């Protein structure tokens, strides 16, 4: 179903969604995939303003952090499309700080967020998969944690009839033709090209002519 100017799109997640947004300015979208999506949709709107786009990404967030602010930052805005991108920090904190985020607890929390939104809003739910493009040898070890976590994201999305944007697959395909660092210099945070690829994957999955 195509996005139209009556829609309110809300994006929430970690630093990949935040992308340097100005938190003192509610209209700030940052310089990442959210901005790219908004720019594309607004360019299509001709003389109209296009859909309302809200960015509630926050650096460093894990899934539990989203739960603590979900009502204020999501439900209260009454969006028609909610996009959630989370998971990489739940993995990363295990390796840089020894903070464990058990996959079953992660999945249960994510499921609660999606189910709560479905109960309270008539909104389309969209989940963007976490991803990793290793640029150091030790980052390859992260897949031990990230792979089952990605599976948990997919299960929670399926259980709550959320659309899935496979950012992980889009970026891995792109990495077959160029260095991973061109897409995510530290393996986690996308470059402008990486953000554009995520935006393109979202538009292909969500802004579709299919019913």
Predicted features and spans:
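Surface-exposed cleft-lining segments at the edges of enzyme active sites
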Residues: 56-62, 91-104, 137-142
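Serine-esterase "nucleophile elbow" of acetyl-processing enzymes
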Residues: 1-59, 69-78
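A short helix->loop->beta-strand "cap" motif at the edges of active sites that frequently abuts
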Residues: 119-124, 162
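Proline-aspartate-enriched helix->loop->beta-strand connector
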Residues: 75-84, 88
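Alpha-helix N-cap and loop-to-helix initiation/capping positions
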Residues: 25-32, 98-105, 140-148, 186, ...
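Conserved, well-ordered alpha-helix/loop/beta-strand core segments that scaffold catalytic motifs
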Residues: 83-85, 111, 125-128, 143
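Substrate-gating cap/lid alpha-helix
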Residues: 133-167
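Histidine-centered active-site loop/cap adjacent to the catalytic His
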Residues: 161-163, 182-211
């Amino acid at each position: 179903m195509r996005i139209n100017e009556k829609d309110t799109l809300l994006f929430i997640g970690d630093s990949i969604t935040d992308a340097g947004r100005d938190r003192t300015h509610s209209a700030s979208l940052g310089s990442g995939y959210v901005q790219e999506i908004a720019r594309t949709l607004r360019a299509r709107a001709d003389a109209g303003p296009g859909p309302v786009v809200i960015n509630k990404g926050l650096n460093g967030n894990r899934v539990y952090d989203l739960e603590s602010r979900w009502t204020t930052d999501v439900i209260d805005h009454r969006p028609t499309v909610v996009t959630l991108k989370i998971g990489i920090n739940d993995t990363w904190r295990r390796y840089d700080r020894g903070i464990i985020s058990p996959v079953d607890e992660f999945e249960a929390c994510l499921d609660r967020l999606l189910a709560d939104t479905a109960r309270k809003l008539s909104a389309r739910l969209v989940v963007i998969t976490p991803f990793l493009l290793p640029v150091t040898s030790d980052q390859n070890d992260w897949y031990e944690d990230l792979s089952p976590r990605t599976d948990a994201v997919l299960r929670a999305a399926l259980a709550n009839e959320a659309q899935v944007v496979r950012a992980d697959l889009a970026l891995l395909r792109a990495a077959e033709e160029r260095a991973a660092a061109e897409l995510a210099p530290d393996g986690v945070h996308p470059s402008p090209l990486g953000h554009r690829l995520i935006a393109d994957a979202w538009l292909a999955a969500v802004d579709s002519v299919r019913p």
